Design a protein with these regions (language model features):
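Short, Lys/Arg-enriched N-terminal segments with co-localized hydrophobic residues
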Residues: 1-7
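Active-site loop/lid in soluble adenylation, ligation, and acyl-transfer enzymes
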Residues: 11-114
């Protein structure tokens, strides 16, 4: 994966246009790589997310989270306690844990030291 990342960072800037059926995470990653910016966990990538894509990213992460729950052998269909857990966890990560990653940074206001 590190080799792939290094290879993509050195790739030409003219990456393919957004294809129908391509996961939104791939589209966002392509934009970040094309700009030759890093995307570590604490980096803000909001400038590379187009309007409406965060909702699609939530759907994508929900699907991935559901596969994690399935791999953990958790019955999310018949256990009312775990229904919609994949969506709740995905939402928690995107809108709470990593909120500063996907939204524009607020304006910084300086106050004089009194």
């Amino acid at each position: 994966m590190i080799f792939l990342h290094q290879m993509l960072m050195n790739a030409p800037v003219n990456l393919p246009s957004e294809d129908i059926g391509t996961p939104v995470s791939v589209k966002i990653r392509e934009r970040v790589l094309a700009a030759r910016k890093r995307f570590h966990a604490n980096d803000n990538i909001a400038e590379f997310i187009q309007p409406g894509e965060l909702d699609h990213l939530l759907d994508e992460v929900t699907e991935k989270m559901q596969t994690v729950l399935d791999s953990m052998v958790i019955d999310t269909e018949n256990d009312h306690n775990t229904q919609d857990t994949a969506r709740r966890v995905a939402k928690m990560y995107l809108k709470e844990v990593f909120k500063g990653r996907y939204t524009e940074s607020p304006e910084v206001t300086e106050f004089p030291n009194a």
